[in-house]
Amino acid sequence: GGGHFLHSRFNDVMDWVFEHSPRSEWNKFQAKVLIDLEGSPVEFPIELNLWQLPTDQQVEYLYSYLTASKKDIEYKNFEDWIRNYLGDKIADNYMIPYNKKLWCIDPSTLNTDWLIKIPNTNAKLVLKTIIEKNSNFTEEVVSHRSFYYPKEGGFQTMFNSIYEHIKDRVVLGYKTKKLEYDSQNKIWIIDDKYRTKNIINTAPWPVLDVHLNGFNFKKEFEKLKYLSDVISLWEREPYDHKAQWKYIPNPDIEQHREFYIHNYAPYSKPGGVMTDINSIRWRQHNKKWKAGVPLYEHENVYSYPMPTTDYKEAIKNILFYCRDYNLFGLGRWGQWQYFNTDQCIKQVLDFFNSDDIKKFDFFKTF
């Protein structure tokens, strides 16, 4: 799950995708991502684009970043990391308000395990961008420096292409509810209907009723928190910029992120915008807000696993116990990790290429 575009630092993932959905059916773009920083548009990643700010703000943000980046500490939580790695200016005006909008919880209650998604920068690189007035970074810094998007049909076409290769082995439109282990015959029974020796679960664990030797799944599931959000489509006047999406930390604007569809899907109608808002904020606004002429709205209950400070023990207990009975969890929900599409595919490729799946390292990204 996850990911609106195709990009990856894993060559084997890109090769696998293009084996199922030919590269010729994709357009490649250089990413242009904006941050609404104190009313000024600054490109992402922020620390490599401070040179785009007015001079007086450049000095303040750069000083804050450089003095923070010298601190050699062990980060206790996500807010600790933000303040001590990026500095208080970026923390207070971008990262903390943005993440409060995204997660609707205090960033100090989030851990740092998911920071593989954060740009890999350093003070030397930041200073270089200020002097040269050019962010000039590579995929090693940010994996989505460039990305692919289907020439037609939207991102779903990738999954449709994969499905065409395996459709004789896929049941669509079926909602699994119960997994029960028959210890005498050492098989799994799915919804009292299907029987199998092995199961790979990619669904959110809490939607399943799992019965296995009296293991208390409910207790562990209660520690697995998740974010729900609302995706909306709007029509606006055609935009006069080339950005594909923007992060919006301003708490007075409902959405935390918006996508400019025509800038990566040129076959779509000019002025089309997709917005993302946490369901909690959506309800706080009585489900009534406006970011253009409304076209469509959908609430996605399971959007992101929340990297809280106590979830890791729970998902480890689940995965390590279940694997001895050939029940494995993979992907964003199976491993309860903040994975994008490419990372989900990478986990599957590594899982099936491992010498012993019972010893597969579910947490090698930590």
State where each predicted segment sits.
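Short glycine-/acidic-enriched loop or helix-start segments at secondary-structure transitions
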Residues: W16-V17, V210-L212, F339-N340
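General small-molecule cofactor/ligand-binding pocket signal
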Residues: N27, R169-G173, Y296-E297, F328
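Mid-domain catalytic core of redox enzymes
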Residues: K175-K290, Y296, A314-Y321
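A general beta-strand register signal
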Residues: D36, V171, I189-D191
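Active-site/ligand-binding neighborhood in enzyme catalytic cores
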Residues: S40, Q58-D182, Y194, T202
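Short, P/G- and charge-enriched loop/turn segments at secondary-structure junctions
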Residues: S21, S146, K218-E222
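Dinucleotide-binding Rossmann-like beta1-alpha1 core, especially the glycine-rich loop
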Residues: G1-K71, N120
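Conserved flavin/dinucleotide-binding core of flavoenzymes
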Residues: P45-I46, R257-F366
